């Protein structure tokens, strides 16, 4: 075979190469986002392994409600706060279910409700909230009578505020240890702003509907009852509800108002349903 033929044969058999295909920008962003989440998860695991349990729990609780960075997410204009889908409110009904824990799935519950305890402010209470499938939501644990002295379960903010003004109040179908709990309604996404508190005695034995009228909720801001002559004072009429919280606290309506039906230690409350009602 001639040299030319050998040369032609060599070049003919040499595989051709093409420039590597570029990954679409959207795909690259997804991969980068996934990698960032993995790195963030590893960092959080390391952080939790060295933090005392109360501080680790506080970090997780703040991130559940405020997003990555916890409280720092509040000052980040690009941070997206986790929310949940608001219930559809139908006009003309005698009641409006907000949360039915008897029919809620575990995934729904985990994406909508979380524990929020006094360890976010240096306390030592240790409580959790769980869903007993087909039965109820349970808030249980231990409270300590130092620092904050509270434990709670709270919903994530609704993705839009709901108007319950045509109703008379909110009822909590519950049972438990007989202590004095309180329901808190939020009308803003700022936890340092005014929120509306109302205390109630938790029934023992069987589930009962505890009715809490909007007119009886009191405005509280940062652990202090807001007085009528103050600029922050406003009443609760149910026209704007953004989140709901159920709490056991050593205080009733502010830090100068002790809860006389509270004792530190073990506690539990079971909740079947939270709904708006008309008399």
Where do the protein language model's features map onto the residues?
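Beta-rich carbohydrate-recognition modules and glycan-binding surfaces
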Residues: 36-279
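N-terminal chloroplast transit peptides
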Residues: 1-29, 40
């Amino acid at each position: 075979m001639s040299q030319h033929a050998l040369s032609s044969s060599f070049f003919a058999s040499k595989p051709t190469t093409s420039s590597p295909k570029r990954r679409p920008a959207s795909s690259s962003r997804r991969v980068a986002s996934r990698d960032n989440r993995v790195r963030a998860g590893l960092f959080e695991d390391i952080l939790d392994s060295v933090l005392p349990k109360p501080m680790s729990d506080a970090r997780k609780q703040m991130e559940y409600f405020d997003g990555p960075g916890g409280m720092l997410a509040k000052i980040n204009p690009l941070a997206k706060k986790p929310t949940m889908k608001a219930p559809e409110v139908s006009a003309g009904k005698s009641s409006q279910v907000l949360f039915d824990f008897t029919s809620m799935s575990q995934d729904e519950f985990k994406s909508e409700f979380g524990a929020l305890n006094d360890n976010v402010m240096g306390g030592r209470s240790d409580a959790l909230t769980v869903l007993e499938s087909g039965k109820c939501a349970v808030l249980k644990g231990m409270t300590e009578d130092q620092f904050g002295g509270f434990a709670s379960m709270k919903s994530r903010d609704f993705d839009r505020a709901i108007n319950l003004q045509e109703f008379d109040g909110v009822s909590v179908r519950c049972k438990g240890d007989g202590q004095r709990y309180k329901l808190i309604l939020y009308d803003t996404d700022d936890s340092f702003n005014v929120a509306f508190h109302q205390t109630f005695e938790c029934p023992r034995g069987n589930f009962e509907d505890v009715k809490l009228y909007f007119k009886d909720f009191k405005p509280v801001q940062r652990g202090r009852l807001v007085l009528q002559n103050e600029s922050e004072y406003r009443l609760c009429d149910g026209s704007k509800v953004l989140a709901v919280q159920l709490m056991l606290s050593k205080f009733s309506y502010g830090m100068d108002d002790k809860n006389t039906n509270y004792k530190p230690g073990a506690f539990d409350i079971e909740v079947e349903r939270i709904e708006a009602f008309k008399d």
